[in-house]
């Protein structure tokens, strides 16, 4: 196997250009999630692919949230959220939650249940992680929210929605 030469970033080279970084990150396939919250500060939701497991003891995941997002002040003030991982047929819902659509219209487009934290659980999601935000860190334009998982709701699903190459793709388990 022959590897293509890559540009490196170090104290001796030019910094990585933002567009090059974004193009490279587009090659990283990721599950598509709708992050939801409900509480004293209101109800909000947004689409995210920057979600991953941190540890299973205690069960913790992280969610990256742009501080300029309309959902940011609501999510952080509520201190709780639900990560709803989408099935292949839910790409339209992903687009709705990823745009500028008013929150009430986003939530009206699907059926929801309520988790132990009070956050909305998406009916038909492949899995929902109901979480309490335990702490956060700010990096660049985003906050990294570390979330302790309080409950997991799994559904029988044979496919998932992933984002790769700036496009949605259905991923089947077969």
UniProtKB/Swiss-Prot annotation:
Q: Which organism is it from?
A: Stutzerimonas stutzeri (strain A1501)
Q: Which N-terminal residues, if any, form the signal peptide?
A: none
Per the UniProt entry, what is one GO biological process?
Answer: uracil catabolic process
GO molecular function terms listed in the Swiss-Prot or TrEMBL record: FMN binding; FMN reductase (NADH) activity; FMN reductase [NAD(P)H] activity; riboflavin reductase (NADPH) activity
Top-level EC class, please? Answer: oxidoreductase
| NCBIfam families assigned | RutF (TIGR03615)
Q: Note the superkingdom of the native organism.
A: Bacteria
Q: Which UniProt keywords apply?
A: Flavoprotein, FMN, NAD, Oxidoreductase
Q: What does this protein do?
A: Catalyzes the reduction of FMN to FMNH2 which is used to reduce pyrimidine by RutA via the Rut pathway.
In short, the EC number is: 1.5.1.42
Question: Know the name of this protein?
Answer: FMN reductase (NADH) RutF
Could you tell me what reaction this enzyme catalyses?
A: FMNH2 + NAD(+) = FMN + NADH + 2 H(+)
State the family named in the UniProt similarity comment for this chain. Belongs to the non-flavoprotein flavin reductase family. RutF subfamily.
Question: Which Pfam families is this protein grouped with?
Answer: Flavin_Reduct
């Amino acid at each position: 196997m022959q590897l293509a030469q890559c540009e490196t970033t170090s104290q001796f080279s030019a910094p990585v250009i933002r567009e090059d970084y974004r193009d490279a990150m587009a090659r990283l396939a990721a599950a598509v999630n709708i992050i939801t919250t409900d509480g004293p500060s209101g109800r909000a939701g947004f689409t995210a692919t920057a979600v991953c497991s941190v540890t299973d003891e205690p069960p913790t995941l992280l969610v990256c949230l742009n501080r300029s997002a309309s959902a940011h002040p609501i999510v952080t003030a509520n201190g709780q959220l639900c990560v709803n991982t989408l099935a292949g047929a839910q790409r339209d819902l992903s687009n709705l939650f990823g745009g500028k659509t008013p929150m009430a219209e986003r939530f009206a487009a699907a059926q929801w249940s309520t988790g132990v934290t009070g956050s909305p659980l998406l009916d038909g999601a492949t899995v929902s992680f109901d979480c309490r935000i335990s702490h956060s860190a700010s990096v660049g334009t985003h906050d990294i929210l570390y979330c302790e998982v309080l409950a997991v709701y799994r559904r029988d699903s044979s496919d998932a929605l992933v984002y790769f190459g700036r496009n949605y793709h259905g991923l089947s388990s077969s």
